[in-house]
Regions:
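Amphipathic alpha-helical segments that form the core helices of the histone-fold
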Residues: 42-47
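Helix N-cap motif at beta-to-alpha junctions
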Residues: 48-52
Length: 79
């Protein structure tokens, strides 16, 4: 099974990287972009057959290592 994980800063946290990219895009002429937030994306190959077990493992990985629960939120899909 494959997990696809997206981690982003919480909406209440300032995103300086996203702001920098947004300003750069405006400089390049992309004036129609309202806002931009950056984040991280991970693909994780799992050697499990049970979908519920895969969800449990990926959720645990996100909580323990990939995401900072104070500043970030995450979501994932299992394929």
């Amino acid at each position: 099974m494959k997990a696809k994980v997206i981690i982003k800063l919480k909406d209440t946290i300032l995103d300086p990287q996203g702001l920098t990219i947004h300003h750069a895009l405006e400089t390049l002429g992309y004036k129609n972009i309202e806002s931009l937030r950056s984040g991280k994306f991970f693909e994780i190959e799992l050697n499990v057959e049970d979908r519920e077990k895969a969800v449990e493992i990926v959720d645990e990985i996100c909580k323990k290592l990939l995401a900072n629960p104070v500043t970030e939120e995450y979501q994932f899909t299992i394929e």
